[in-house]
Regions:
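Repetitive, compositionally biased segments used for assembly/scaffolding
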Residues: 23-141
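Positively charged n-region of N-terminal signal peptides that target proteins for export
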Residues: 1-4
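Sec/Tat signal peptide C-region and signal peptidase I cleavage site
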Residues: 16-23
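Bacterial N-terminal signal peptides
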Residues: 7-16
Length: 141
């Protein structure tokens, strides 16, 4: 049964809050070349590079997600807010935020509140990522 994924483009890239109805999601660059994938686990999500090697993980917490590298070391976290998520580094310093509007567009901001990009689902169900100028930089499906 397909489950609703909340993917964070954490960015390092990943953790966006775009909802994709599948247990596995692939990421692509602006030219359509596969760059990685995300798979749902019992505790959250694992991320993989384009060759299928595990590159990190995201584990659910009571307030959001913790982010770990491939060796299991914590590298940051995401905490749920009323409009999306705030992102923090491993020391607890805020590094950015993701806010989803009523139009379904998720906008990414840096720690100073400046827009750095956005995510929007298209008619085919893909989530398209744009930079702050509105140029397509990647997609998720």
């Amino acid at each position: 049964m397909k489950k609703l994924l909340s993917i964070f483009l954490l960015l390092g890239f990943m953790l966006l809050t775009a909802n994709i109805s599948d247990a596995a999601v692939n990421s692509y660059d602006q030219y359509g070349r596969k760059t990685g994938s995300y798979r749902e686990t019992s505790t959250g999500y694992n991320s993989y590079d384009k060759n299928g090697s595990k590159s990190g993980s995201y584990r659910k917490t009571s307030t959001g997600y913790n982010k770990y590298d491939k060796n299991g070391s914590k590298t940051g976290s995401f905490r749920k807010t009323t409009s999306g998520y705030n992102e923090y580094d491993k020391y607890g310093r805020k590094t950015g935020s993701y806010k989803t509007g009523s139009n379904g567009v998720t906008t990414k901001y840096d720690q100073y509140g400046r827009k750095t990009g956005s995510f929007k689902k298209d008619s085919s169900g893909r989530v398209i990522e744009y930079d702050k100028y509105g140029r397509k930089v990647g997609s998720y499906k």
